[in-house]
Amino acid sequence: MCRKIWGKVVVVMLALLIIMPVCAMTGCSGSKEPDNKTSVDYTVVENADLPDELKKLIESKKDKVMRLTYTTKDYTYVVAGYGTRETSGYSIKVNNVYTGDNALYIDLNLIGPAAGEAVNEVEKYPVIVLKMERREESVVFKM
């Protein structure tokens, strides 16, 4: 009886030794950067300069994490929001905006309040809007 159990344990251990490295190797190939990156010109737009319909859309979604695009005849607006934050002092950094592999990539980071920075205990909704010439590619957000 003990031999049967020990034999099953050995089989399971050998299977794990084979399966684990295979799983680990395939996990590394997940998110690949495009080979042909091309920078895209953009402008960070203030709320006052947005189309009214886009302002309303942002206002209705600001309390949740938001990734959206809005296109007019001439421009594409790319909107990213990080939802509700309990204090002031947050900003959004644009790391890169580029095209590659038939997509527009938007690489952003949320920057929290600096250590020791005075903050107000008030709900804030960090949102950034990037305006660029009209684009047809799908958008990939890296947030």
PLM feature spans:
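Exposed, flexible binding/inhibitory loops of compact, secreted disulfide-stabilized domains
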Residues: 2-16, 21-143
